[in-house]
């Protein structure tokens, strides 16, 4: 019995360690986009993030999927790669300061201009749609790249600006 369980525990531990290392050594979006004046990577737009991406973390996707925020809040996830600010009691959205902190945290999980290398897009995407296999403990939030919320996150990763964002 133990011989069957031990490999699973070791495998889960290695996966967790790899995720932490990827996060720890991932350059921030600012570092990636400002390291050279002629960098081709787009800047991540805070206003687009706040208006179109951040609400996705609070959105209930379906009866069998919890909101991202349920697991990815600082009190629950405590320092993991996607640790969102705690909402104030009774609040339905983050304050400006909290949103800016979330932007900084979430930006570390994307490679501006490269959705295929952005963990924020690949981890919650179903493996058959191009997501990473067995990496997101909370289930697959996106069945395909055609999901409107997935497309909003991709647009942000690609440098979409709030002023140019299409209407819902």
Kindly give the residue locations of the regions a language model identified:
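Bacterial N-terminal signal peptides
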Residues: 11-24
